[in-house]
C-alpha cells in the first residue's frame, strides 16, 4: 500500500459514506451500531497484532502515549486563548477546544504510517494514540461537562468501564505483553493484519462520512484557518521539541522519531 492509495482510501471512504447518507441508504442508528461492532470485534485484534510486531524493551518507546498526550494538552493553550478572545458561547467553545485536543492520529496518521513504513509503524502509532481513549474519558468528557450539559450523564467509573469495553485498549496491552515476553508471532498473521488494517480504516471512515454535513463547513472559515495553524504548525513544533528532548532522534531505530513527527502534524479529528 502506497501513500497515494492510502489517501485515496481515506477520502474515498468518507465520500462514499457521505453519499450514502445523502441517498438515505443508511439510518440514524447505523453509525453508532457499526462503530460499536468494529470497536468490539475488529479493532482489538488489529491492535494486538500490530503491537506484537514491535519491540517494546526500551523505555523511550513505551513513553510514546505520554508524548501524544503532552502534544494534545499543549494544543489547548492557543485554542483556549482564542476561545476567550472570540468570546465563544458554551457549545461552540467546547467544540473548539475538543478540536484542538483531538487530532487525526488514527484514521489518517496511522494509515499513512502503514502505507509508508509498514506494520511496525502502524503499531507505534497505535501506541502513540493510546492516550486518545484515555483523553476521551478524562479531558474530553471534562470539557463536555463544562461546556455542554449542566449535569454529567455518567459517573467517572462508568466512563472508565466504557474505555475498556469500546476501544482497542485490551488488544493493545495484550500485544505489548506478547512482544515484551518475546513470544514469536506466526507469519500468517502478518498477511491477515495487512488486509485488516486498510479494511477496518475504510469502514470507520465510511461511518464518519455518514455523519458529515458539508454545507456547514463554509460558515466557520475563521475557526478552520486558526485550527489549521494550531494543528499543522504549532503542534508539530511541540512534538518535535518533546521528541528531541526525550531522545527519540538518537534511537537506533529512526521509526520512532518519524512516527512522532508524523502524528504530531495531523489535522483535527473528524469524529
Residue locations for each model-derived region?
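Alpha-helical transmembrane segments of multi-pass small-molecule/ion transporters
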Residues: 1-271
Amino acid at each position: 500500500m502506497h501513500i497515494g492509495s492510502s489517501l485515496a482510501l481515506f477520502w474515498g471512504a468518507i465520500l462514499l459514506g457521505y453519499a450514502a447518507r445523502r441517498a438515505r441508504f443508511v439510518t440514524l442508528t447505523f453509525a453508532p451500531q457499526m462503530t460499536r461492532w468494529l470497536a468490539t470485534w475488529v479493532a482489538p485484534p488489529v491492535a494486538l497484532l500490530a503491537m506484537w510486531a514491535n519491540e517494546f524493551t526500551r523505555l523511550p518507546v513505551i513513553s510514546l502515549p505520554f508524548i501524544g498526550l503532552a502534544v494534545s494538552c499543549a494544543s489547548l493553550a492557543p485554542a483556549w486563548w482564542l476561545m476567550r478572545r472570540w468570546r465563544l458561547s458554551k457549545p461552540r467553545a467546547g467544540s473548539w477546544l475538543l478540536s484542538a485536543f483531538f487530532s487525526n492520529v488514527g484514521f489518517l496518521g496511522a494509515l499513512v504510517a502503514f502505507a509508508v513504513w509498514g506494520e511496525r509503524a502502524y503499531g507505534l502509532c497505535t501506541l502513540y494514540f493510546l492516550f486518545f481513549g484515555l483523553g476521551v474519558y478524562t479531558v474530553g468528557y471534562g470539557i463536555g461537562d463544562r461546556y455542554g450539559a449542566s449535569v454529567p450523564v455518567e459517573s467517572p467509573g462508568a466512563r472508565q468501564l466504557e474505555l475498556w469495553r469500546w476501544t482497542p485498549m485490551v488488544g493493545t496491552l495484550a500485544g505489548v505483553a506478547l512482544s515484551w515476553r518475546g513470544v514469536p508471532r506466526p507469519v500468517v498473521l502478518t498477511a491477515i493484519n495487512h488486509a485488516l488494517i486498510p479494511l477496518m480504516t475504510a469502514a470507520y471512515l465510511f461511518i464518519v462520512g455518514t455523519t458529515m454535513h458539508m454545507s456547514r463547513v463554509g460558515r466557520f472559515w475563521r475557526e478552520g484557518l486558526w485550527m489549521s495553524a494550531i494543528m499543522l504548525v504549532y503542534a508539530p513544533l511541540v512534538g518535535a521539541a518533546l521528541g528531541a528532548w526525550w531522545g527519540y532522534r538518537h534511537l537506533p531505530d529512526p521509526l520512532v522519531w518519524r512516527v512522532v513527527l508524523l502524528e504530531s502534524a495531523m489535522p483535527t479529528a473528524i469524529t
